[in-house]
Amino acid sequence: VSSTASDVYKRQNVHTAQDEGFHIVRRCTGGGAMFIEPGNTITYSLYAPLDFAHGMSVEESYELCDYWLVEALRALGLNVRFAGLNDIATQYGKLGGAAQRRFAPTHGGPGAILHHVTLAYDIDAEKMTRVLNISREKMSDKAVKSAAKHVDPMRSQTGMGRDEVVARLVDAAVRVTM
């Protein structure tokens, strides 16, 4: 999945991705490219009136939207933190990334904020490095030596099946909304 402004040919090895059976799609939010395999990722989206983030910086709105997730992941035993503007990471690497778009009010409507997150439940790191072009700058920002070590999937840390992780995250999200 490529962000709205990304150059697909710079961010992905398009021919390799197609040979591996991937379809490259573009989302309407910013951020980088995401490597998504069905069953190996967990995603969620929030859609709220723009007033939800009124008076907040972009960074504050990311933290508000993902606070419940960070707490839920900690309850699963993961040592997670916010990393930069849009990443959720452990001491070993990136666990997930968020992106956001704000829609201005139109036709008398309130405007909206779209926020979504992709989490690595499990990952084929070697395949990811073949499909994505991850820059040296990105690696140095993350203080890791290889793209394969850049991502830290939760399966190896929790020992839980994906369905159990999803169920616990849903329970945490429901508790926050009540």
PLM features per residue range, with description:
Residues 13-15, 32-34, 97-109:
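A generic local secondary-structure boundary/capping motif
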Residues 60-62, 66-79, 101-178:
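Long, positively charged amphipathic alpha-helical accessory segments at protein N-termini or as interdomain linkers
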Residues 41-43, 85, 94, 114-118:
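Broad gene-expression machinery/nucleic-acid interaction feature
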Residues 1-9:
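Single conserved hydrophobic/aromatic residue that forms the stacking wall/gate
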Residues 13-54:
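A glycine-rich, hydrophobic loop/mini-helix early in the fold
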Residues 38, 91-92, 123:
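Short acidic-glycine loop/turn motifs at beta-strand connectors
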Residues 81-104:
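Beta-rich nucleic-acid/ligand-interaction surfaces
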Residues 41-88:
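Contiguous, small/hydrophobic- and glycine-enriched helical/loop subdomains that border
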